[in-house]
Design a protein with these regions (language model features):
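Cytosolic regulatory regions of ion transport systems
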Residues: 1-399
Length: 399
């Protein structure tokens, strides 16, 4: 890869932007030197590991990230001629019917989910979520006023010590453990069960970790560890120790057992898994897995987006990291009072009141209407919903 970068940059006159995947993090600094400011470098291990952790924390998150990373639905774009100079960020969130304003670029600094009172200027470039950048041309202003008398609990919180189970071990696992620790409240626990590898743990602050070497396709082993009290389950593939199809086959067997056990104990804890071969993702759906992260597929989506616009690098870094604002799916009653005829503009206003940015909704009703995992991203402000207990609002929030 280093030689390829040298070949692309040695003449110096070309300003074409380059996006490169880094397999070995030891090559990162050298690649930065060769790239000479023209190259966006994507650390594959970091990207996949962080996405695994983000999606394991809440069911439906993978559907949100997939929507934001690919080109089939609504994704990130940048809006320069927005006409909102002098408006606050809270007002900007409600300004357009079919566009979700989620932040702005101020000079070289990207800010997602800024304080609602932040005043925009003509020099600010908006970060938005929209179906296509062509939809920004002549975008109509929203005429839907939020129903402020329908707002919900402003101070809702669900932070508590968590119990996580990590099945399997590979080169990305130490990063997964590190990221789990960053999100875990003090007093949380993590159990690692693996057939291969000798887990070496990073320095941890919040997690108490136990490690067991055992056969992860064994029903007896899984019966011992897959319990109703778990908050999240992650299954990693053995791509370091086995060939692709054998590793995926073992992952699928593990997933089948895990789902069967969870069904018997009456738990709906999210199960997130890696799958090396994208073709095996269809088979994984038979196991009723909430969110399957396919390493190669997600990296390809991110690389494609970055090649289109280098400004996305800062956006992706923030939403995949533990610092700044990232994706959360939180109880809808925190934002609006459950009931009929709730406009999306009202939900957006409820999120703004909590210093959060609403970008979507998760509901069983949406699942019955064909939305993947019951999740819709960037609904029109004028869209009307029936909000029920168990529904969740997708937001950008700092914690």
């Amino acid at each position: 890869m280093i030689k390829s970068l040298l070949a692309l940059t040695h003449q110096g006159g070309d300003t074409t932007r380059i996006v490169a995947e880094i397999q070995d993090p030891d090559n990162l600094e050298a690649a930065k030197l060769v790239g000479n400011g023209r190259t966006t470098l994507l650390d594959i291990r970091e990207t996949v590991a962080k996405l695994v952790v983000q999606t394991s924390r809440q069911s439906g998150a993978a559907a949100v990230y997939t929507e934001l990373f690919d080109y089939e639905g609504d994704e990130f774009y940048f809006y320069e001629d927005h006409g909102l100079a002098g408006s606050t960020y809270a007002e900007a969130q409600l300004a357009f019917d079919a566009v979700s304003v989620v932040g702005f670029i101020d000079g070289s600094v990207t800010k997602l989910n800024p304080p609602p009172s932040t005043v925009l200027t003509a020099e600010h470039t908006l970060v938005v979520i929209v179906e296509d950048d062509s939809a920004l041309s002549g975008q109509s202003r929203s005429r839907t006023e939020p129903a402020l008398n329908r707002l919900g609990e402003q101070l809702g919180s669900d932070e508590h010590p968590t119990q996580a189970l990590l099945i399997g071990w590979n080169d990305r696992a130490p990063i997964v453990v590190r990221e789990l620790d960053r999100y875990a409240p003090p007093g949380s626990t993590l159990t690692i069960v693996t057939t291969y590898g000798e887990p070496e743990l990073p320095p941890l602050t919040n997690l108490a970790v136990t490690v067991e070497k055992a056969q992860t396709t064994s029903r007896a082993v899984l019966d011992k560890h897959v319990v109703a009290a778990l908050d999240q389950i992650i299954v990693l593939c053995y791509d370091r120790d086995l060939d692709t199809q054998t590793a995926d086959s073992r992952t699928l067997v593990t997933l089948l057992h895990v789902r069967d056990i969870l069904g018997k104990v009456g738990s709906d804890v999210p199960v997130v898994s890696e799958m090396i071969d994208d073709r095996n993702r269809v088979l994984a759906s038979v196991a009723d897995v909430d969110d399957v992260v396919v390493s190669g597929e997600i990296v390809s989506l991110v690389v494609t987006q970055l090649s289109e616009d280098g400004r996305l690098e800062a956006v992706f870094k923030e939403i995949l990291g533990a610092e700044g604002s990232e994706v959360y799916l939180r109880p809808a009653e925190w934002y609006v009072q459950p009931g009929d005829d709730i406009t999306w503009a009202t939900v957006v206003a409820g999120a703004s009141r909590r210093n959060e940015t609403a970008i979507g909704l998760k509901s069983p009703l949406l699942a019955r209407e064909g939305q993947r995992f019951g999740v819709v991203v960037n609904p029109p402000k004028s869209e009307v919903y029936t909000i029920s207990p168990g529904d969740a609002v997708v937001v950008f929030a700092e914690d």
